[in-house]
């Protein structure tokens, strides 16, 4: 009796060595002064400011909804993911979340029914 199936053992692949980046010198805050203090544009150049896209969108929303009454509270929740009270849905990135800790999971009693998603 000889077994001619394929082996399930795979040899480990050789690791590729990646050289670390060269250290030129100590990191100093002076090297990153443009991130801390933005440079002021000259008089001939238009002023461009780096803003957070969400902050820019809020500014646009305020101007558009100024005469439309109170604002809906869409900013209190995640946009596109309304809270339903169900904790077994995918995360905001569409990836599955880790399973809950079995010690923290409570089993429903006989009279109660657990909500299904």
Swiss-Prot record:
This gene belongs to a multigene family expressed in a large variety of tumors whereas in normal tissues, expression is restricted to germ cells. These genes organized in clustered repeats, have a high degree of predicted sequence identity, but differ by scattered single nucleotide substitution. Their sequences contain either the antigenic peptide YYWPRPRRY or YRPRPRRY which is recognized by cytotoxic T-cells. Residues 103-117 have a biased composition (Basic and acidic residues). Residues 32-45, 87-96 have a biased composition (Acidic residues). This is G antigen 12F. InterPro entries: GAGE, GAGE_fam. Residues 1-117 are annotated as: Disordered. Forms tetramers. Belongs to the GAGE family. The gene is GAGE12F. Transmembrane segments: none annotated.
